[in-house]
Structures are given as structure tokens and as C-alpha cells.
Amino acid sequence: MATDLTVEVEDKPGSLASIGEALGGSGINIEGLFGASVDGRGLIHLCVEDGPAARKALEGAGLSVTDEADAILGPAVQGASDPGTMGAMARQIANAGINVKAAYIATGNRVVMVTSDNAKLMELMANM
């Protein structure tokens, strides 16, 4: 299972580079990334395969990891560029009673999701 790490950084040039350099320097690949500026701070969600090693690298570089959660790094989404694909997928997840806490696109048209029931989501995705 993959890990979603939330890193809080200053909203300034170079903050994202610091994250990439810390992970790259430790041989850790970023599978997916989402970032936004919120109230003058940068909030970055990262999907990595080795959460403990990524956390160690980030904190070793003086970066603040504010949250960590198990994440599903799903297979490539068929028709990812077609209108309605995400809506149809999200409807199936909602109909199964699963709450999506975080979702973003990863490399290779894969999707990263942190949910209220990752095991149930994995079963559902196997049948999509």
C-alpha cells in the first residue's frame, strides 16, 4: 500500500524544490503530488511507496510532515481524459458508502485516494 504524506511549507519560491530534492536525494520517487496555497502556507500531498523513508528524508531536510495516511495507488484509469470518467468512478465509490478524504492524479494516469475504507475501495476498484 502507498502512503499519502502532507507536507506544510512556506508559500515561496523553492519550497516545492526542497521537497523534490530531499526525496530525490534519498532515492524516493514521488508517485503523485497535489499542492495548494492555503492561508499563506503551502500544503503538499505526496504519494510515495515507502512512507517511513520519505518521512525520514523530509524531516531530515527540516521539512514539516503534518499528516500521514495509507493510500490506494490505483491502476491506470481507463478513459481518464474522457468527460464524465471521474464522475462515474466517484458515483460508484459513493454508492458503496466510501468517503473520499483525498484524491489526486498520479503518474501514468493512476489515481491516488485516501478514503474511509481503503480495503472496500480496493475490492470495488478490482471490479470497475
Predicted ranges, named:
Residues 1-128:
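A conserved regulatory-domain signal marking ACT and ACT-like small-molecule sensing domains
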